[in-house]
C-alpha cells in the first residue's frame, strides 16, 4: 500500500503520475495523502479552514490523484490525512466532519469502498463509522504516543523514535494487542489494522524490512488491509 502526496504544489502532479504508474505495475494499492495546502511547513503546521473550504480542498486533492490512478488502470482505495490535518481531525469535530463529507462525495469517482485511515478512538474515526465509511485503524511505528492515544508533538524531544530495536518491539506489541509505553511512562494499548512508518524517518527503508521480518517471526500475517 502506498499513500501518495495529494497537495497541489510544485511538481506534485508529475510525481503523482509516476507513483501511480509504479504502483499499478507492482499491484500496490494507492491512497490519497490529503493535507493542508502548506508547502513551506510540509503540511505539519496547524491551519484554520472554513468547513466548506476544507471539504472542497479535500475533494479536489482526492479527485486529482484519482484521475492519475485511473489513467494508468488503477484507483484510489483509501484516504490518509497528513500531518497537522491528521492530528487536527483526531480531536476537532468541524474539520473531521468536513473530511468525512469529502470522502462521501469522492465516492462518486473512487467507489463506495473508499476507506479512511484514522487513529483509533479519534473524532474522525467516530464520525466516519457513523457515516458508514470503511475505517482502517492506524498505529505509528516511529512516533511516540501521549497517554490519551494522540501523537506527541514533533517539537518535543523523543517524539520520533528511530532506534531500530525499539521500533520493531513496539510494532510487534501493537500488532499483538500488548501495551506500549506512552510518553509519560504509562502503559497504552493501541488497536490497529495498519502500521505507519514515515518515509523521512532516518533509515526508513531498512527499518521497514526489519519491521516486516519482526512481525513474520512473531507469527503476524503481513498483508494490505484494503
At which residue positions do the language-model features occur?
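Charged helix-capping and loop-helix junction motifs
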Residues: 92-100
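Single conserved hydrophobic/aromatic residue that forms the stacking wall/gate
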Residues: 1-13
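Conserved, mostly hydrophobic/aromatic
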Residues: 33, 79, 197
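Active-site rim beta-loop-alpha module in soluble metabolic enzymes
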Residues: 121-179
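C-terminal domain-boundary segment and adjacent tail
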Residues: 206-226
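Glycine-rich tight-turn/loop motif centered on a GG-T
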Residues: 6-7, 40-55, 89-92, 110, ...
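Acidic (Asp/Glu)-rich catalytic clusters
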Residues: 18-31, 70-72
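Glycine/small-residue-rich loop that forms an oxyanion/phosphate-binding "nest" at active or ligand-binding sites
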Residues: 39-72, 78
Amino acid at each position: 500500500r502506498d499513500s501518495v502526496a495529494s497537495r497541489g504544489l510544485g511538481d506534485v502532479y508529475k510525481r503523482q503520475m509516476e507513483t501511480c504508474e509504479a504502483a499499478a505495475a507492482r499491484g500496490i494499492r494507492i491512497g490519497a495523502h490529503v493535507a493542508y495546502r502548506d508547502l513551506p511547513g510540509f503540511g505539519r503546521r496547524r491551519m484554520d479552514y472554513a468547513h466548506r473550504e476544507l471539504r472542497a480542498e479535500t475533494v479536489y486533492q482526492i479527485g486529482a490523484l484519482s484521475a492519475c490512478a485511473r489513467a494508468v488502470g488503477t484507483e484510489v482505495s483509501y484516504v490518509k490525512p497528513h500531518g497537522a490535518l491528521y492530528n487536527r481531525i483526531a480531536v476537532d469535530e468541524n474539520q473531521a466532519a468536513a473530511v468525512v463529507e469529502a470522502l462521501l462525495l469522492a465516492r462518486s469517482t473512487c467507489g463506495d469502498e473508499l476507506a479512511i485511515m484514522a487513529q483509533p478512538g479519534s473524532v474522525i474515526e467516530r464520525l466516519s463509522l457513523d457515516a458508514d465509511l470503511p475505517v482502517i485503524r492506524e498505529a505509528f511505528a516511529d512516533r511516540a504516543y501521549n497517554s490519551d492515544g494522540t501523537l506527541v508533538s514533533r517539537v518535543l524531544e523523543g517524539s520520533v523514535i528511530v532506534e531500530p530495536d525499539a521500533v520493531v518491539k513496539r510494532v510487534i506489541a501493537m500488532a499483538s494487542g500488548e501495551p506500549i509505553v506512552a510518553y509519560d511512562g504509562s502503559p497504552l494499548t493501541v488497536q490497529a489494522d495498519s502500521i505507519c512508518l514515515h518515509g523521512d524517518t532516518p533509515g526508513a527503508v531498512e527499518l521497514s524490512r526489519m519491521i516486516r521480518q519482526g512481525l513474520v517471526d512473531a507469527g503476524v500475517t503481513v498483508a494490505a488491509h484494503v
